[in-house]
């Protein structure tokens, strides 16, 4: 038994799927990368996210980008992808331009 499976068993987590199914709502060309609006299912809940994929040949490293938690609950994934808010929070698009695949989900009760 792997360490991850054993830890999941100890703390009562559901088994981790090898692949996560998702739907793609839209794709936008952002010069050095594409930004896809996606939704995926986790524990019965749809999670909206942006998926930023660099152009060119991979493989590419990947990173999960979480947004800040503040009074602007209508901002979430869009702020870290440079669409709204504080330009200093726009690190998702900078990472995509640097060659990283970025997934930027909304936290519960933010944006969508």
Language-model features: locations:
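Predominantly extracellular/luminal regions of secreted and cell-surface proteins
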Residues: 1-6
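Glycine-rich phosphate-binding loops of nucleotide-dependent enzymes
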Residues: 7-19
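N-terminal cap/lid segment of alpha/beta-hydrolase-fold proteins
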Residues: 16-58
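Generic structural hydrophobic/aromatic packing signal, biased to beta-strands
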Residues: 22-24, 38-40, 64, 95, ...
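Short beta-strand element of the alpha/beta-hydrolase
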Residues: 49, 59-70
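Residue-level preference for short coil/turn positions at secondary-structure junctions
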Residues: 58-59, 98
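Cap/lid segment of the alpha/beta-hydrolase catalytic domain
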Residues: 66-112
């Amino acid at each position: 038994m792997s360490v991850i499976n054993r830890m999941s068993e100890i703390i009562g987590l559901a088994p981790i799927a090898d692949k996560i199914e998702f739907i793609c709502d839209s794709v936008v060309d952002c010069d050095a990368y594409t930004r896809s609006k996606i939704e995926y299912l986790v524990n019965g809940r749809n999670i909206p996210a942006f998926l930023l994929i660099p152009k060119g040949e991979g493989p590419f490293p990947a990173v999960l980008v979480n947004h800040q938690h503040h009074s602007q609950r209508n901002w979430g994934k869009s702020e870290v992808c440079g669409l709204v808010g504080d330009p200093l929070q726009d690190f998702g698009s900078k990472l995509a331009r640097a060659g990283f695949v970025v997934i930027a989900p909304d936290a519960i009760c933010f944006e969508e």
